[in-house]
């Protein structure tokens, strides 16, 4: 018993540690992915307006490397999470991710962090596309002919690709927030359903509020259950009597109730004796009938003996009557 009791907490603790590791891998991979995308965009967009010798190769190498490492970490964490979920479903254990962080599930926290990272990255990319780089001599392209140089049209020095990509990444971050909200609602509904299934017979003392249009109708709380379940769970002093009522005595035992009266059945026995007294009819006196009311069930033979006994003295004077 003790080994089984200690094995279950160890298994739950191991599952929680694995969940924390998966959460860390998800967050670390998402951060690497966002940083790699930012470095790659900034490096390649900045280097396309400069000669290759003046552009740093670190940005071109570090950006894609970080993005690939982050994507691989996210895929690894996702596969490990699926394996853990299948193992828990096979063993029938409870999900430790339901209250992972501040009472929220792990998926909800992951979606929040992903949304925040993508939202921040999209805003940074949009800022880079609008204000960086400025209009300088190094970034200005050479005019193709002399006629165009005379025209005083302002040059657009911002990156059009960054201006398009930034809002798209912000939109992806907002989608992650929506997914987090949906995850929270689904977790609340599932926990409510499980609580209703486990304690479906619990009595609620709160009034019921129903909204119809602009008005709110308040109904009183439902009445308590007619038959309490506690009486069935805990044996009460009257449980034996209830059991006796549910299982009536045998038919043959009904004839022996008058012979061995109990304190509980004395009233019923007296009533039954009175019924026997008033239903018996015969030539005997009332004292005899009252006396025979308490006799056993073999009463008819004794009545016959009493009837034959007074018949003999009646016949004797008839014989001696003639002189």
UniProtKB/Swiss-Prot annotation:
Residues 251-268 have a biased composition (Polar residues). The keyword rRNA-binding does not apply. It is a multi-pass membrane protein. One of its GO terms (cellular component) is membrane. Keywords: Membrane, Transmembrane, Transmembrane helix. Its main location: membrane. Pfam families: TMEM171. Residues 281-290 have a biased composition (Low complexity). The chain crosses the membrane at residues 22-42, 57-77, 112-132, 159-179. InterPro entries: TMEM171. Residues 251-323 are annotated as: Disordered. It is found in: Membrane. The keyword Membrane applies. This is Transmembrane protein 171. The lineage of its organism: Eukaryota, Metazoa, Chordata, Craniata, Vertebrata. The gene is Tmem171.
């Amino acid at each position: 018993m003790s080994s089984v009791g200690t094995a279950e907490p160890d298994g739950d603790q191991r599952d929680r540690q694995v969940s924390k590791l998966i959460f860390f891998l998800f967050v670390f991979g998402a951060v690497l992915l966002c940083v790699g995308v930012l470095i790659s965009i900034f490096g390649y967009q900045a280097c396309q307006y400069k000669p290759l010798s003046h552009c740093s190769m670190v940005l071109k190498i570090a950006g894609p490397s970080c993005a690939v490492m982050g994507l691989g970490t996210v895929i690894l964490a996702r596969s490990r999470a699926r394996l853990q979920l299948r193992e828990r479903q096979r063993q029938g254990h409870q999900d430790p991710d339901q209250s992972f962080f501040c009472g929220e599930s792990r998926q909800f926290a992951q979606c929040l962090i992903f949304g925040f990272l993508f939202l921040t990255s999209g805003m940074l990319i949009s800022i880079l596309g609008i204000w960086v780089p400025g209009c300088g001599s190094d970034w200005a392209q050479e005019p193709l002919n002399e006629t165009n140089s005379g025209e005083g049209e302002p040059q657009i020095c911002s990156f059009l690709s960054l201006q398009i990509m930034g809002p798209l990444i912000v939109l992806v971050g907002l989608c992650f927030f929506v997914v987090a909200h949906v995850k929270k609602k689904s977790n609340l509904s599932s926990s409510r359903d499980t609580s209703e299934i486990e304690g479906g017979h619990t009595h609620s003392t709160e009034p019921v509020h129903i909204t119809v249009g602009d008005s709110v109708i308040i109904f009183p709380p439902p009445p308590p259950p007619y038959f309490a379940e506690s009486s069935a769970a805990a044996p009460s002093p009257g449980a034996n009597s209830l059991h006796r009522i549910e299982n009536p005595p045998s038919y043959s035992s009904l004839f022996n109730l008058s012979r061995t009266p109990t304190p509980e059945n004395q009233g019923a026995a007296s009533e039954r004796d009175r019924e026997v007294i008033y239903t018996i009819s015969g030539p005997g006196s009332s004292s005899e009938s009252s006396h025979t009311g308490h006799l056993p069930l073999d009463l008819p033979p004794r009545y016959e003996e009493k009837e034959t006994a007074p018949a003999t003295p009646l016949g004797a004077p008839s014989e001696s009557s003639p002189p």
